[in-house]
Amino acid sequence: MSGIVGICRTGEKQLVEKMLAKISHRGTGGKRIFAKKGGVLGVVYQKGEKPPFLNNPRGTAVWDGRFSGDLDQAETDSPLALAALKGGEVFLIRDGLGISPLYYGEVDGTLVFASEVKALIGVASKIQEFPPGYKYLSGTGFQQYFGLKPVEAWPLEQEEAALRLRRALEEAVAQYTAGRTEIGSLLSGGLDSSTLAALARPQVDRLHTFACGMEGASDLEYAREVADHIDSIHHEAIYALPDLWNVLPDVIYHLESFDALLIRSAITHYLVTKMVADYVPAAFSGEGGDELFAGYAYYKDLDPDDLNGELIASINRMHNTALQRVDRAASAYGTEAYVSFLAPSVVKLAVHIPVEYKLHAEADEEPVEKWILRKAVEDLLPEQALWRPKVKFWEGAGVEDHLADYAKTQITDADFRQERRLPDGSFLNTKEELLYYRIFTEHFGNLTDLDFVGRTKGAPKVPEPL
């Protein structure tokens, strides 16, 4: 985990210092600033990690994510946001899925960029998200180098598909366990998080698993069962409703969003990651499993011919919703999240697996979501966890509609009608979202440029006023 900032103009070291201070939580172990011909770059990083910068006759670079060190080989679908200065030109690149965050804006017509929006607010105008799968060169502008698109399924038998998926996931997890004796894994007791925890356990001496929820939440029960089954060192955070209200301002500040469904999940993610930081510097997180293997309920309503395209679209939407949540929760506490379902080898295989293996039904039975993933790990997990239906993070943790109910006590119908129109002309969906937006503006002001705020597909909403 690290954080980068920069500007495509010389003589701006003081500005870069100011921007780095806004994202200092992303790296408390070290800081470097490079003022070169063509611009100024800055990076903060965690203690103990390999410093994420290079400075040699071939060029200067700072990055967040995984980088080989070769600027000519920077195009990747592994986590990476990189900025480099070479020959007086600034080069920027973001990974193909948007796992590592990057944003940009303008200062007097000059490009400025940062890992988080908060470093740009008050500095830049026209703040936008740097698009995943793009690179930028100051002399030529933006250019797309990667885009995930629907592909033809490979002619795989069920057993072969399950075996290949198991191997790909084992290798994806091993990338992060290699050389370690201890690592963490978020564990909700659902299929995705349980899979990563079970795969990681034999690869390390000590696996710490982390679950959180309100007393009696189903996630806690399922997570305990899985933790006992795989023999992990299990930790729990049990919270009450006041804890949710109290943590909201911090969550929204780090998340940089007011999207209601995203914040619901982010609260529980934030609380569990706080616990991670007490034990290990990094933990696996199960994002990507639902999008790759058809885990969401609405997929069952789609025509089979449309399902593959919607799965690809779902993966391409993750950069400013689920992946943003994972990154901000981890960075808030100086930890790192490993999303092994989105490892390049896993994604490449998954998009070629026939969709009928993902939503699979026997005879006239209801289709089972993520069926091929369940088959790939059926020997690893207890039966209850293996066949547990999909539950949203905030539902399984016991949050359910408590946040929406709380918002109704804070915001009147008249308030909602008067305040739901945003400065950019769009509308807030619910009173819950207005509650979050009010907190958002307390942190960041009444921004007119809100293009960087991702919105969850299928979020509940009321009709827009005429």
Language-model features: locations:
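Cysteine-centered catalytic environments shared across enzyme families
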Residues: 1-254
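Adenosyl-5′-phosphate
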Residues: 1-4, 278-285, 291, 304-466
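Hydrophobic (often cysteine-bearing) scaffold residues that line and stabilize catalytic clefts
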Residues: 12, 77, 158-165, 196, ...
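Short, motif-level signal for alpha-helix interfacial/capping segments enriched in acidic residues
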Residues: 38, 79, 266, 314, ...
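Amphipathic, well-packed alpha-helical segments that form the structural scaffold of globular domains
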Residues: 166, 170, 174, 201, ...
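ATP-dependent adenylate-handling ligase core
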Residues: 215-273, 298-309, 328-331, 352-363, ...
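Short, solvent-exposed loop/turn and secondary-structure capping segments
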Residues: 294-296
